[in-house]
Amino acid sequence: MNYKYTYESPLGTMIMLGTLTYLTDLFFVDEAHAPSYDDAEYIEQLTGPFEVTIMWLDQYFNGKKPFITPPIQLEGTEFRKSVWSILQTIPYGETTTYGDIGKKIAKQQGKDRMSAQAVGGAVGHNPISIIIPCHRVIGSNGKLTGYAGGIERKKYMLDLEAKHK
């Protein structure tokens, strides 16, 4: 059985998708790369993973580093999963670059280097926005680039984290 739930964040409406056991997607309704899903296949219900997700988001948007993470289940290629795994290690209030993530992936795979563009593609298709902090990835020149939820949201979240670091 598939479930969904709507969350009203300070940055706009978000949709949670998942099962009784896991959160599988969290996204802004208007973001690029939002998953397409058949609404008829989802029951609108507050599940255990969604309750934990709401606690996490409430803490986050109140300027606190969340202390509990919802159980997540990621679907994607091995490459994307490895990028998403690295994203989860970026500390609250800090940033990294696409190139730095590429170097980590290359090292994991025993390669000399990895394309920052390939990393950017995986980052841009992160299924669990905010909790898997793709908004903490910036360009090598320090500029804010490419957040599926929009640059203004990315700036808001980075400013929020910097203020409460």
Task: Spell out what each predicted region is.
Residues 20-69:
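Compact structured core domains
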Residues 1-24, 32:
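DNA-contacting interfaces and partner/effector-binding or oligomerization modules
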Residues 5-13, 55, 64-165:
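Nucleic acid-binding interface residues in structured DNA/RNA-binding domains
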